Amino acid sequence: MSDKPDMAEIEKFDKSKLKKTETQEKNPLPSKETIEQEKQAGES
């Protein structure tokens, strides 16, 4: 196996076979309020 991708393989790749997927955020960032509450809980 070489590190470089096989250009012939890339050229014959059919993009239409790819399915469109809806991106779902799995790890939404906590809100500022949540962060502040956790900070205060950790300090007490």
Curated annotation (Swiss-Prot):
Keywords: Acetylation, Actin-binding, Cytoplasm, Cytoskeleton, Isopeptide bond, Phosphoprotein, Ubl conjugation. The modification N-acetylserine is found at S2. Induction: By alpha interferons. Decreased levels in THP-1 cells after treatment with recombinant interferon-lambda. Signal peptide: none annotated. There is a cross-link at K12 (Glycyl lysine isopeptide (Lys-Gly) (interchain with G-Cter in SUMO2)). The modification N6-acetyllysine is found at K4, K12, K26, K32, K39. Residues 1-44 are annotated as: Disordered. Its main location: cytoplasm. The keyword ATP-binding does not apply. The modification Phosphoserine is found at S2, S31. Expressed in several hemopoietic cell lines and lymphoid malignant cells. Decreased levels in myeloma cells. Residues 1-25, 33-44 have a biased composition (Basic and acidic residues). One of its GO terms (cellular component) is platelet alpha granule lumen. GO terms for biological process: actin filament organization; negative regulation of actin filament polymerization; negative regulation of canonical NF-kappaB signal transduction; negative regulation of inflammatory response; positive regulation of ATP biosynthetic process; positive regulation of blood vessel endothelial cell migration; positive regulation of endothelial cell chemotaxis; positive regulation of proton-transporting ATP synthase activity, rotational mechanism. The modification Phosphothreonine is found at T23, T34. It comes from the Eukaryota. It is found in: Cytoplasm, Cytoskeleton. GO terms for molecular function: actin monomer binding; enzyme binding; protein sequestering activity; RNA binding. Belongs to the thymosin beta family. Identified in a complex composed of ACTA1, COBL, GSN AND TMSB4X. Interacts with SERPINB1. PANTHER family: THYMOSIN BETA, THYMOSIN BETA-4. Plays an important role in the organization of the cytoskeleton. Binds to and sequesters actin monomers (G actin) and therefore inhibits actin polymerization. This is Thymosin beta-4. It comes from Homo sapiens (Human). The lineage of its organism: Eukaryota, Metazoa, Chordata, Craniata, Vertebrata. The gene is TMSB4X.
